[in-house]
Amino acid sequence: MRALLLFCFVASLLLSGQAEETEDVSEEVPMRDRSHIEKTLMLNEDKPTDDFSAVLQRLRKIYHSSIKPLEQSYKYNELRQHEITDGEITSKPMVLFLGPWSVGKSTMINYLLGLENTRYQLYTGAEPTTSEFTVLMHGPKLKTIEGIVMAADSARSFSPLEKFGQNFLEKLIGIEVPHKLLERVTFVDTPGIIENRKQQERGYPFNDVCQWFIDRADLIFVVFDPTKLDVGLELETLFRQLKGRESQIRIILNKADNLATQMLMRVYGALFWSLAPLINVTEPPRVYVSSFWPQEYKPDTHRELFLREEISLLEDLNQVIENRLENKIAFIRQHAIRVRIHALLVDRYLQTYKDKMTFFSDGELVFKDIVEDPDKFYIFKTILAKTNVSKFDLPNREAYKDFFGINPISSFKLLSQQCSYMGGCFLEKIERAITQELPSLLGSLGLGKNPGALNCDKTGCGETPKNRYKKH
């Protein structure tokens, strides 16, 4: 009995000694210096956050007075499914994190914000840990906001997400964190892609939700783990959704210090080989190779290369932040160009329909013939002859079959009839916004002018539209 007690005592001492040794080892894990993050993103500067409210208010006014009337009149939202809200106009740049499960998306966000070992940090792990779309925003104190509340708040840019249903809103969460970087940018963490899970099992249209965030993101980080480079159906679908957004995409090969040099080169080549069929552009997106977490790089790895890659990524992020207003104005102008072209096309369809109709004609058959073969009636060629219309901006012809299937042609008016005595003409207002008002607002940023003091004699400013019925 005495021998048994002695054995138990010695065993407990050994186990406690091992536990203390393990604890000491865990405490001795070297952490990486973060000074390059603060320096590159200018987080240590004490200057107050720039106040862009005057420019954004001016931009919002141009949109509502010069663009939205034509957009609503010709139901552009039903063609592109992209409705611009006031919250979207005034929102901060959005950085979207996409990729397979457990590749380090949440860990990367924690690292960039310095949230490790704080009560603010996102939960991370080797298993799929993120099942929600998590939006990290700035706030005076730590606060969690339910998705249903975010969608109901018209001041935020997330109110259109309500259309994806209550099941999705339960998977949407907002977190306000008092962090200086979040004063200038918003991070969005997404559920990892799991190839063996059917989309229907998520309970909401996952791909449609991803497309909504992709369309509004200023920078898109697609993160990969070098040990998991398999490209399945969901990842293929994701890259199809990213078509046309190649300039915003940055591909990240994370956890790079886990591999030896030769293996890292093989993985780098394998990544390009896997993605080549999915990214059909002349200039591929930039690929960053590093390890985005707070622990020191593993020994005998390319530390200098990884650090330079990380700084390059931070410079990319800072560039998006610095060009926030320029990008926002350019986005609204591009939207206005698309709305104008859509209105011209609908007007041309309507004019052709009226020209072909006779007293004995069947209106439904006449218009069906026009929609089925618009080239026969020179619909798109006529629009290309207009001023400032590029063939690369023309929508797909097939899209108008669906559009007019929902919206009868009789529900629209000709552009020549979209004029009022006091308000002027919708087409003239949007053209003035595209050619004068928005470029002038953009130019005022470089000159440091007050946007409220622009020369309204030159730009029109959307305040007093020309009265085309006034006698001279």
From Swiss-Prot:
Molecular function terms, GO-annotated: calcium ion binding; GTP binding
Dynamin-type G domain: residues covered: 89-330
Swiss-Prot/TrEMBL keywords: Glycoprotein, Membrane, Sarcoplasmic reticulum, Signal
Region of interest (G1 motif), residue spans: 99-106
Sugar attachment sites: 280, 388
Record's subcellular location: Sarcoplasmic reticulum lumen; Sarcoplasmic reticulum membrane
Region described as G4 motif: spans on this chain: 254-257
Keyword field contains Glycoprotein: yes
Residue span of region G2 motif: 127-128
Region feature (G5 motif): 277
Matches recorded under Gene3D superfamilies: 1.10.268.20, P-loop containing nucleotide triphosphate hydrolases
Leader sequence residues: 1-19
Membrane topology label: Peripheral membrane protein
Tissue distribution: Detected in skeletal muscle.
Region G3 motif, annotated ranges: 189-192
The name this protein goes by in its record: Sarcalumenin
Gene name, Swiss-Prot/TrEMBL: SRL
